[in-house]
């Protein structure tokens, strides 16, 4: 009799375990999602909140979300150190070449979205050099288009008698001490913009131009986020290499600022990838799919960013954040409605050796000699 009772108990426990295992396997997504990202909380916080709301509505699952904020080089290094056992599910933001390098190391999972959604995203954007918007091998995909441009204070520029429309306007002597920028070894947006000048003019003439810019620079900030902030507060007239959403956040906060997208300025697709060994892979894949949906792309448009696909445009009712984005960037609704100039070649800028060369040259020839450059020595 005792044996029969024991057999019944084991049968019950086995069925219970199997039921729970099957239930967890059938669950559409996990209830947690973690990012490691250089993308500002002005963007990743609304994106995570919107996804959590979406998951609750679609699957009735409460998803706990969080982000590990790290600069691009630090985030990349951290992922390498994790060695396939990451403490985050997704890497979001930075240059596509870093994602390519992680894929080569076997540290990324293929992106799993519908073929129709994948095909809607163009392979590249820009001429004469096409900037990749997705990985041909499928390990990363762009999420939104974000220009690195110039933020300025209209009233302050008017007082100085200066107009800002393109890069060379920054070299006006009237802007002496009025420009803010972040060092290229601390900011991917600054580094990419330095590369734009180096690839436009060549190594020697490009550095000559950047030294002239340094002569008008009043501050090198420690973080790229600080550049639009000091301009918004009126401490400086112009900010160099500012991501559009960072500039737009200052406008939304009530500051009188404007944004210029100069010729051949770098446009990042804000790449996203699922990390190999991600603790919550289903939630990670669902997050990517959500951001590329109409709802996700509309969210970006409210934050000063642009759709990654020609299918959507920045538009909304009068007075909406979407229309403020359009006005803020000079009437632009889509990068696919206009010719986009791009000289940034990832094959040149991407290798680790090149990145170190640019950063090293900057530190030795500009950062260490900045006072002399300002004095014209």
Predicted stretch roles:
Residues 86-91, 109-150, 168, 178:
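A structural signal for short loop-to-beta-strand junctions that line the ligand-binding cleft
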Residues 177-182, 290-312:
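Periplasmic-binding protein-like
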Residues 36-39, 134-145, 152-155, 159-160, ...:
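Short beta-strand->loop
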Residues 27-101, 228:
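Early extracytoplasmic/lumenal segment of secretory-pathway proteins
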Residues 151-156, 268-283, 299-300, 308:
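A bilobed periplasmic-binding-protein/Venus flytrap-type ligand-binding module shared by bacterial periplasmic
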Residues 186-261:
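Ligand-binding pocket segment of bilobal, Venus flytrap-like solute-binding proteins
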Residues 300-377:
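C-terminal capping/gating helix-and-loop segments adjacent to ligand/active sites or protein-protein/ligand interfaces
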Residues 102-111, 128-129, 135-137, 248-261:
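Ligand-binding "clamshell"
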């Amino acid at each position: 009799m005792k044996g029969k009772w024991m057999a019944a108990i084991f049968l019950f426990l086995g069925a219970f375990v199997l039921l729970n295992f099957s239930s967890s396997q059938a669950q559409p997504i996990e209830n947690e999602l973690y990012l490691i990202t250089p993308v500002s909380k002005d963007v990743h916080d609304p994106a995570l909140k919107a996804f959590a709301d979406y998951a609750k509505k679609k699957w009735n699952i409460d998803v706990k979300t969080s982000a590990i904020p790290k600069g691009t080089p630090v985030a990349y290094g951290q992922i390498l150190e994790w060695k396939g056992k990451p403490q985050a599910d997704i890497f979001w933001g930075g240059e596509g070449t870093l994602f390519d390098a992680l894929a080569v190391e076997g540290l990324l999972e293929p992106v799993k979205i519908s073929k129709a959604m994948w095909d809607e995203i163009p392979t590249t954007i820009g001429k004469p050099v096409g900037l990749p918007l997705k990985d041909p091998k499928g390990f990363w995909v762009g999420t939104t288009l974000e220009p690195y441009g110039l933020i300025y204070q209209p009233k302050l520029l008017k007082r100085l008698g200066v107009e800002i429309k393109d890069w060379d306007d920054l070299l006006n002597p009237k802007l002496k001490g009025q420009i803010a920028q972040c060092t290229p070894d601390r900011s991917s947006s600054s580094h990419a913009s330095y590369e734009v000048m180096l690839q436009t003019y060549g190594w020697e003439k490009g550095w000559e131009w950047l030294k002239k810019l340094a002569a008008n620079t009043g501050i090198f900030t420690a973080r790229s986020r600080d550049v639009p902030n000091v301009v918004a507060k009126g401490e400086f007239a112009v900010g160099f290499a500012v991501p559009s959403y960072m500039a737009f956040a200052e406008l939304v906060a009530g500051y009188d600022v404007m944004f210029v997208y100069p010729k051949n300025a770098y446009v990042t697709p804000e790449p996203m990838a699922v990390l190999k060994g991600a603790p919550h892979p289903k939630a990670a894949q669902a997050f990517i799919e959500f951001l590329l949906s109409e709802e996700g792309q509309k969210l970006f448009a409210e934050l000063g960013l642009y759709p990654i696909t020609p299918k959507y445009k920045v538009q909304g009712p009068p007075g909406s954040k979407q229309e403020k984005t359009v006005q803020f960037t000079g009437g632009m609704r889509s990068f696919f409605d206009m010719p986009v100039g791009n000289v940034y070649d990832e094959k040149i800028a991407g290798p680790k050796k090149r990145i170190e060369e640019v950063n090293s040259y900057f530190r030795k020839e500009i950062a260490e000699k900045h006072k002399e450059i300002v004095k014209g020595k």
